Amino acid sequence: MSYRRKSWLEKLADKKCLPKTLRLEKGFPCYNAVHKMGAEVGDKVVLVNPSEVVEVMKMVPEGRLITIVEICRKIARKHRVKACCTLTTGIFIMVAANAAEEASKQGGNLNIPYWRTLKAGGFLNEKYPGGVGSHKKLLEKEGFKIIRKGGKLAVSDYEKYLVHV
């Protein structure tokens, strides 16, 4: 029996096991990131479905930005927990971006302005379709200035453009 790789659109489908709330442990892969956001061992952390992440991504209008940190904070508030797993959220952001491009190539439109979603610190996402080069072009098309921070690309003064969701 041969294996067929799932499409990005298939990967974007909600999972039956999510959302799920867990108590934060030091061994969690997202521990360091959620700890930086204020969560402590024993605090409740939510893992959500891709649709919840996409819902927040779609709220960002042209000329505005959001980072994974703001997305996680909004989702955590919605679920009345201390934090949202940044690892699964980051994966779903990347899946949403690739699914949007896949749909576009098939003549569809998911209306996900994924390029307005940045990594923490305003950095561009190398896992978006076309890598940071394409991400940079899409952001510059909307008037954002891209700078080099260390060895990575970021939006200059990204904090000024953050949408409050």
Question: How should these model regions be labeled?
Answer:
Residues 2-165:
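Nucleic acid-binding interface residues in structured DNA/RNA-binding domains
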